């Protein structure tokens, strides 16, 4: 498997610092993943498969998916986060391929995955490459903040890191949308499950 990336030392150090300062705050999977797994992933792939976890950090989603019997590739810019993921995985580490690199210029390789997922990460320019990484018949799971988050406490405020209303469904153009929701439940988010046609 080969990926092509660029480098961003400032961003890497920012995330390294976040993981060092709060190492135990990154482990509970977002509730969207277990729900999407039972409603969409499991019916399509009852015997498991491979997944790509974008900006997977300390491994909360990759480890959960590995617990369900999946093989997962976790990519994150933070060496600290990825090392925490490796340690947090324990014996499940043999089912997770850990990659430290910048995602801002990600290029999909010939390797495709049954599931590609990203939680609270937004780099619009690489969205087409993320879609390419989904195998035919596979799923894209995505959840991140919307512009409404700028008015709430916590979370990102930079508009470059926030979705416009309806934008996530537009970014998934060419995929069949199975689930889409924008909500204000403590955080302003959009979530999507979309399938690449066979």
Describe these PLM feature segments:
Residues 122-134:
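A short, conserved alpha-helix within the catalytic core of class I
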């Amino acid at each position: 498997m080969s990926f092509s990336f660029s480098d961003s030392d400032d961003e890497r150090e920012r995330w390294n610092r976040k993981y060092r300062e709060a190492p135990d705050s990154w482990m509970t999977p977002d509730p969207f993943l277990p729900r999407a797994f039972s409603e969409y992933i499991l019916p399509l792939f009852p015997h498991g498969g491979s997944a790509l976890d974008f900006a997977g950090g300390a491994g909360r989603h990759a480890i959960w998916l590995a617990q369900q019997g999946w093989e997962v590739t976790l990519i994150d810019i933070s060496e600290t986060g990825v090392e925490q993921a490796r340690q947090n995985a324990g014996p499940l580490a043999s089912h997770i391929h850990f990659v430290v690199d910048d995602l801002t210029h990600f290029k999909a390789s010939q390797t495709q995955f049954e599931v590609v997922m990203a939680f609270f990460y937004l780099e619009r320019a690489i969205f087409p490459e993320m879609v390419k990484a989904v195998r035919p018949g596979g799923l894209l799971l995505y959840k991140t903040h919307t512009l409404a988050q700028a008015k709430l406490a916590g979370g990102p405020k930079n508009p470059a890191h926030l979705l416009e209303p309806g934008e996530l469904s537009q970014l998934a153009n060419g995929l069949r949308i199975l689930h889409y929701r924008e909500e204000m439940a403590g955080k302003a988010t959009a979530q999507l499950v979309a399938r690449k046609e066979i």
